[in-house]
């Protein structure tokens, strides 16, 4: 019985190995082509997020994390969140260069440029008063932009509580 079992496994392994051996194409075999993808996969690959998507997914969480880091006086995390916010804003302008015939990067700079520079200075100096004012100005810039673009119903504010239960904002 044991011999039959061993022979059965050996035969299965041999068949499996033979099945995995690649065939050598002949000179007359046409090359394999991959058909164009259709359906959900190709749609996902061609998806370009809109300005609203990018603001919601990239900018808003980083704005909140920056505020939460400041509330805990975690200057290292505030510096990191600030850089992430800078990159997120730049990404929005790169992914969506135009919105309703407006240059997105220029809009962002005009509404947030000065407060972002002030935030950078405040973080470097660990100046809580300067940070608080610059963060308020940044938040106001966001809301001014929303209003100017007829989206005044989107109101950004300083976070009251964290939406990130798995992240500690207190300095280690």
Positions of PLM-derived features:
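Bacterial N-terminal signal peptides
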Residues: 4-16
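Sequence context surrounding c-type heme c attachment/ligation sites in exported
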Residues: 23-172
């Amino acid at each position: 019985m044991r011999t039959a079992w061993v022979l059965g496994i050996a035969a299965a392994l041999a068949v499996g190995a033979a099945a995995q051996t690649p065939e050598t194409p002949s000179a007359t075999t046409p090359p394999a082509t991959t058909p164009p993808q259709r359906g959900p996969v190709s749609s996902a690959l061609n998806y370009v997020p809109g300005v609203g998507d990018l603001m919601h997914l990239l900018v808003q969480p980083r704005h909140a994390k920056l505020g939460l880091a400041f509330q805990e006086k975690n200057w290292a995390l505030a510096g990191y969140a600030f850089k992430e916010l800078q990159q997120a804003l730049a990404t929005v302008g790169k992914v969506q260069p135009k919105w309703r015939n407006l240059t997105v990067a220029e809009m962002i700079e005009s509404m947030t440029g000065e407060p972002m520079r002030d935030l950078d200075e405040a973080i470097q100096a660990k100046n809580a008063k300067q940070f608080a004012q610059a963060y308020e100005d940044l938040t106001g810039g966001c809301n001014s932009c929303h209003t100017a673009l007829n989206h005044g119903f989107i109101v950004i504010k300083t976070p009251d509580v964290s939406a990130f239960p798995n992240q500690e904002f207190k300095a280690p």
